[in-house]
């Protein structure tokens, strides 16, 4: 070992050099080209130029630091290294040009690079005729970042990266391959060694409990075929089947179905029941099964639990072949503090807030994104665009929006920090959501976004230019809570809660609403929907049939969690399949048949969907019959005769000669009756059609089934 090495040499050997290109690789010294290479465990290294000339490099440090001159002065070269009895020709990663352009760095610096996924992460690349992988990661406060993986025996001294403007670290690793596992080895700002970090922009990851990122070649990801462009329009029917991929169905040994196995059965099932969309609970990589995906660590990676990115594309493609739109639950509000993830990524609060009064979610123990950082907002917006572009999904439903909007969300007095105006609104989160929606709709005008927002925040689904947040839809949590509270009560008490049904129409058109019967309503001791229904067995199923019919007749798009369509008895359990054996029982078959017919009617009748989000499309007919628990209303479409009369009887009594006024004289056909024997009901109804009693003041005399809802349309 030569004694008088420069400090930079020791920094390389000790794995703490922040800019290894300044010392390693080729360097002009006078008229000569000096090559320096650090190859731990190598006993001998030669530099071999493109003409075959060879020069032996001198070992100047026992750790594996070699120095010498290029044989012909300059040009391309390889390193021929001897490891024990094996000789290997290597391309020197420190002879290649930068990966990020000056324009990339400019956009990254101002937080407007809209395609982070094309630059950051791991990307196959050919430089100077050499194939390899380009690695880029943000770590502005790190002293040193190395990429470690299968290609270097996970040795952090082997491939230290160089830092570019704004704290982006990069390195091209020759001969690294798609399929290689990798992580980032980071030394923090105070010299502290951090846990190995997964790539925030990795396109794939190992199966938990392992946490390495996996190199994916984006060129191998075929683009799914698109869904019909009008599938998300406000005037189109939208009936969403919400699915947790790990528990919809399972194999006999309780193992998951893969993405490709799901592709063979799920789209056909959804099509058969008449749903227009599926919505997947988060598919992003996540370490904890019990989070259901809502605590993701890999926002750009579909979870490896069910297969590869190519396999997930096959599932999306299968849905699109059936003209089924695909929506993803998306979680930009918080992330877990697992040591391999985003938390304390570069030894500082890079993605989160440093102050726990701002940065930690009290309910979930997770960390909250710092929307005041341009890098964080750029990361999240790019992720949204990534799923819409690369996977051709049709929309994103944003989770837990209320927790993003309010600084005091679920916090005690004194446990939060006001905004600059002294208020509780998270101004940076508002700006982020507006930018997210603006960029999504600008680039994907046929896509949609939906907000799970549980407060009365105004204009969630109104355009940004009019002061709104810019979402396409908002979940109507108030409707869900009020109506479930009503229907779960014994009918004898419902007259005292008549307003819970009426109240929803006071605000039904203030937003573009989705009526959600989601996974959150069938867990944590709430019981299944059928489990909430009062009465004996027959009444429970009749109540549920009436409630579902009421939902499909109510203004707003529809969402139903898996299992609800056949009256799953148990609460949902993410660790096991739905109870498909229940479909051997007639009453459960009846619920499923009703959902199929409700979806069919909803899609077929413009009156039930065209004006879901427009007050012109709804008119109350009966609101004052609380004693008999009866409601009636008209749904309207754009055409003058596109009308549907809906009468709901939430009493177990049968009412004959019940008079209801209608807009047109003549015959009205009973197009659906939730009490039909086909669905398990008592078959009380109107024998298919009813004639108005008076031509001047048209009125129908109806038989109202017990705990039933009927739909009638005028005959042409």
From Swiss-Prot:
Q: Please give the superkingdom of this protein's source.
A: Bacteria
User: Enzyme group, top EC level?
Assistant: transferase
The terms under GO molecular function for this entry are: 1,4-alpha-glucan branching enzyme activity; cation binding; hydrolase activity, hydrolyzing O-glycosyl compounds
The record's EC number reads: 2.4.1.18
Keywords, sorted A to Z: Carbohydrate metabolism, Glycogen biosynthesis, Glycogen metabolism, Glycosyltransferase, Transferase
GO CC terms: cytosol
Q: Name the pathway.
A: Glycan biosynthesis; glycogen biosynthesis
Q: Where is the active site?
A: 399 (nucleophile), 452 (proton donor)
Question: What assembly does the database describe for this protein?
Answer: Monomer.
Q: What does this protein do?
A: Catalyzes the formation of the alpha-1,6-glucosidic linkages in glycogen by scission of a 1,4-alpha-linked oligosaccharide from growing alpha-1,4-glucan chains and the subsequent attachment of the oligosaccharide to the alpha-1,6 position.
Name recorded for this polypeptide: 1,4-alpha-glucan branching enzyme GlgB
């Amino acid at each position: 070992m030569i004694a008088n090495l420069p400090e930079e040499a020791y920094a390389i050997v000790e794995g703490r050099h922040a800019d290894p290109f300044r010392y390693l690789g080729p360097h002009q010294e006078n008229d000569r080209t000096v090559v320096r290479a650090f190859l731990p465990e190598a006993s001998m290294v030669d530099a071999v130029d493109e003409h075959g000339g060879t020069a032996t490099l001198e070992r100047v440090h026992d750790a594996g630091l070699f120095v010498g001159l290029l044989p012909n002065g300059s040009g391309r070269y390889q390193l021929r290294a001897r490891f024990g009895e094996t000789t290997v020709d290597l391309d020197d990663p420190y002879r290649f040009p930068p990966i990020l352009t000056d324009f990339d760095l400019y956009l990254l610096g101002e937080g407007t690079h809209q395609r982070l996924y094309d630059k950051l992460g791991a990307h196959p690349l050919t430089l100077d005729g050499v194939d390899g992988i380009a690695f880029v990661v943000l770590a502005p406060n790190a002293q040193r970042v190395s990429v470690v993986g299968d290609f270097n025996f996970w040795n952090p001294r082997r491939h230290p990266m160089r830092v570019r403007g704004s704290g982006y670290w990069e390195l091209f690793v020759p001969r690294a391959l798609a399929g290689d596992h990798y992580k980032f080895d980071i030394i923090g700002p105070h010299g502290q060694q951090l846990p190995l970090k997964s790539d925030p922009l990795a396109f794939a990851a190992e199966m938990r409990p392992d946490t390495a990122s996996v190199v994916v070649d984006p060129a191998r990801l075929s683009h799914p075929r698109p869904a019909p462009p009008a599938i998300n329009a406000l005037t189109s029917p939208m009936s969403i089947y919400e699915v947790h991929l790990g528990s919809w169905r399972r194999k006999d040994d309780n193992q998951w179905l893969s993405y490709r196995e799901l592709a063979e059965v799920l789209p056909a099932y959804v099509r058969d029941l008449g749903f227009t969309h599926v919505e997947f609970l988060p598919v992003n990589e996540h370490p904890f099964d019990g989070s259901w995906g809502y605590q993701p660590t890999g926002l750009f990676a579909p979870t490896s639990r069910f297969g590869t990115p190519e396999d997930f594309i096959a599932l999306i493609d299968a849905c699109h072949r059936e003209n089924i739109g695909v929506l993803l639950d998306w979680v930009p509000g918080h992330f877990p503090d697992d040591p391999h993830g985003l938390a304390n990524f570069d030894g500082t609060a890079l993605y989160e807030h440093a102050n726990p009064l701002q940065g930690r979610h009290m309910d979930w123990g997770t960390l909250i994104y710092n929307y005041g950082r341009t890098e964080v907002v750029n990361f999240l917006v790019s992720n949204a665009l990534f799923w819409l572009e690369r996977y051709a999904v049709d929309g994103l439903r944003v989770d837990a929006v209320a927790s993003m909007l309010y600084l005091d969300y679920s916090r005690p007095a004194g446990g939060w920090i006001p905004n600059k105006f002294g208020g509780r609104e998270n101004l940076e989160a508002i700006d982020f959501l507006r930018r997210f929606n603006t960029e999504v709709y600008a680039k994907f005008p046929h896509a949609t976004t939906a907000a799970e927002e549980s407060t009365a925040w105004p204009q969630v689904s109104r355009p940004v230019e009019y002061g709104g947040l810019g979402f396409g839809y908002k979940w109507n949590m108030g409707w869900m809570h009020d109506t479930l509270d009503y229907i779960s009560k014994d009918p004898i008490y419902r007259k005292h809660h008549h307003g819970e049904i009426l109240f929803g129409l006071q605000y039904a058109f203030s937003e573009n609403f989705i009526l959600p019967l989601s996974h959150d309503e069938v867990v944590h001791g709430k019981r299944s929907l059928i489990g909430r229904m009062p009465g004996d067995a027959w009444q429970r199923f009749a109540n549920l049939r009436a409630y579902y019919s009421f939902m499909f007749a109510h203004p707003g798009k529809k969402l139903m969690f898996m299992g609800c369509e056949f009256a799953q008895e148990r609460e949902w359990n993410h660790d096991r399949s739905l109870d498909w054996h229940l479909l051997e029982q007639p009453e459960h078959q009846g619920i499923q048949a009703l959902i199929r017919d409700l979806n069919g009617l909803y899609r077929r009748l413009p009156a039930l969907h065209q004006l879901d989000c427009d007050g012109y499309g709804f008119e109350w007919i009966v609101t004052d019959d609380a004693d008999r628990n009866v409601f009636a209303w008209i749904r309207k479409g754009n055409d003058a005769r596109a009308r549907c009369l809906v009468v709901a009887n939430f009493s177990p009594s049968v009412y004959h000669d019940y008079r209801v006024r209608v807009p047109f004289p003549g015959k009205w056909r009973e197009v659906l009756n939730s009490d039909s024997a086909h669905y398990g009901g008592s078959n009380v109804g109107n024998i298919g059609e009813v004639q108005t009693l008076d031509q001047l003041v048209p009125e129908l005399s109806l038989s109202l089934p017990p705990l039933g809802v009927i739909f009638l349309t005028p005959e042409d």
